[in-house]
Amino acid sequence: MASGSALIFDEEMSRYKLLWTDPACEIEVPERLTVSYEALRTHGLAQRCKAVPVRQATEQEILLAHSEEYLEAVKQTPGMNVEELMAFSKKYNDVYFHQNIYHCAKLAAGATLQLVDSVMKREVRNGMALVRPPGHHSQRSAANGFCVFNNVAIAALYAKKNYNLNRILIVDWDVHHGQGIQYCFEEDPSVLYFSWHRYEHQSFWPNLPESDYSSVGKGKGSGFNINLPWNKVGMTNSDYLAAFFHVLLPVAYEFDPELVIVSAGFDSAIGDPEGEMCALPEIFAHLTHLLMPLAAGKMCVVLEGGYNLTSLGQSVCQTVHSLLGDPTPRISGLGTACDSALESIQNVRNVQSSYWSSFKHLAQSETNPKRPRLDATNGGPKESSEPASESNPKKTAQDIVWPEPLKRMPASVRTVVVPPPGVELTLPKNCQHSGDISESTAKEVQRIRDKHFHDLTDQNILRSLGNIISVLDRMMRSDEVCNGCVVVSDLSVSVQCALQHALTEPAERVLVVYVGDGELPVKTNDGKVFLVQICTKETEDKCVNRLSLCLREGESLTAGFMQALLGLILPVAYEFNPALVLGIVGETAAKTGLMTVWGHMTCLIQGLARGRTLTLLQGYDKDLLELTVSALSGASISPLGPLRALKPEDVEMMEKQRQRLQERWGLLRCTVSES
């Protein structure tokens, strides 16, 4: 099984620059590349990655995405003087040429292909290519927007040709629309392209009508192009997560990619003069983490834009931390996406409802996508309503300050496992069996028993409680362990013990995710615990800190589970922001189809609570235990395969729960409020 992350970088790609005055191009500087690599080296991340050498892309590889005429024209640039380079650059839009840029562009494309090879040959699980010039604006016969060759488009076509791939997902989180990628694949159903980008109703570069949400692809490619336009600046962590939860991830799981390529532009981060957005660098840790379970972990991240050197370096580090499997940082202050973001999300979901099962129910349940455009009076940009003056100077992106991201240190032990007595289990790397229970742990077990379980005498159950407390202490108090898995016999007692111990000191909030029927003794009315229950029997919820999802068994059970996970459970969980996640599987649940997605849920919920996840499995099921340990250890999870359409009853149930809870948990919202 592949493991590790590749890092591809060569300082040679920094050896070109703007040779004349051009305000539109002056922000694209060599330091973008060197600062990114230096940040990785300073934080010890470059040293933890597998260094893969750069190579030049061949002409045949470049011609996968570009015309011979364009390639021949670019090949002439090394022999041009400055005046000739200026004249050549003026043929295109917002791009400059240099005598060394052809060489660097071949290296950038070749580095991207090296990354694809490393991932597809399973030499590594994933990786990042730090490249320059960027590529996503470049078109078949035109340079554009600092881009010469379209690195990601070439990579996708190369992967299709060399590895016989039928489904590639390209995620473009750069703040500009990657129109070059869209043009390349808009008729190709084998490539799903998702781009969010600053648009402002076509007033922002590249000012194209085809960058709007209504451009869904052409012919056989209809539905495989998803544009999510940002129609105002200042988008936040909440807006980005809402886009992932309510648009990208449902479609991505339905598409079931064999490879994920990210056009990673970090001009969508806070402080960037191009994007003028407010999302923190830490958000890229989570965006990366949320994509990693797809395609059995095969993920290639390729640098695009990013023009604030501070937020660029921080964002690159956050991305690579997640690729390496380090615990994700907690993000506080999440809530409802802004009205402008919700309008775009709603419009995308509506226009894509003809193509994706995840959205098919929206034709009846959501409003017409042709809503009036938001302006400053109803949720649109307000920047122009307060002109700058000496007493009220308008802040630029460079004036914004934000806290330095906290260090993300991997625990010395990834996963501690407590199987049933007598069961031998071969553990993945960086996992270990729990040791003997300490004297202090034994005393804590006795204290909890005396206080809550006077009549408990079963030594096996008491031993389980000791193991639970021991693992929790190593996770929460010493940070020695990231997560754990304990097989228990009495679920009720075990859950009560875990919550009692966790809430006494280290964890101010605990998220409980319970897969199974029957009641758990969990109190949620004090706001310290949020309970999610996924079951097959009807239950009634009244508390805003409880979410019960009764899914109908059958062929669409997996699709229903994933829709609930992505559209309901994760939004609530991220906003709740727990310090600990308690994942629980009841004895009967292991025998249902729910277990096919348990591994994916276990992976995804580790984005919460800095990865502090304790799973309790009732009874011994070898396959379930191995699946759980594999997911906790960060190993790749097998794809689910294409998802079936949801049952109408499940859709209705989920929408009722969304309506019930979204007033309290705003990240559930995916439509603009009508009030």
Swiss-Prot record:
Annotated site residue numbers, Substrate specificity: E274
Family listed: Belongs to the histone deacetylase family. HD type 2 subfamily.
Effect of D94A: No effect on steady-state kinetic parameters
EC number annotated for this UniProt entry: 3.5.1.48, 3.5.1.62
Ranges for region Disordered: 362-399
Subcellular location(s) of the protein: Cytoplasm; Nucleus
Name this protein carries in UniProt: Polyamine deacetylase HDAC10
GO biological process terms on file: epigenetic regulation of gene expression; homologous recombination; macroautophagy; polyamine deacetylation; spermidine deacetylation; swimming behavior
Presence of keyword Cytoplasm: yes
Keywords carried by this UniProt record: Cytoplasm, Hydrolase, Metal-binding, Nucleus, Zinc
Main EC class the enzyme belongs to: hydrolase
Active site annotation, chain numbering: H137
PANTHER family: HISTONE DEACETYLASE HDAC1-RELATED, POLYAMINE DEACETYLASE HDAC10
Function: Polyamine deacetylase (PDAC), which acts preferentially on N(8)-acetylspermidine, and also on acetylcadaverine and acetylputrescine. Exhibits attenuated catalytic activity toward N(1),N(8)-diacetylspermidine and very low activity, if any, toward N(1)-acetylspermidine. Has a very weak lysine deacetylase, if any.
Residues where substrate binds: D22, D94, Y307
Keyword Cytoplasm: yes
Pfam family, one: Hist_deacetyl
Residues given in the record as Zn(2+) binding sites: D174, H176, D267
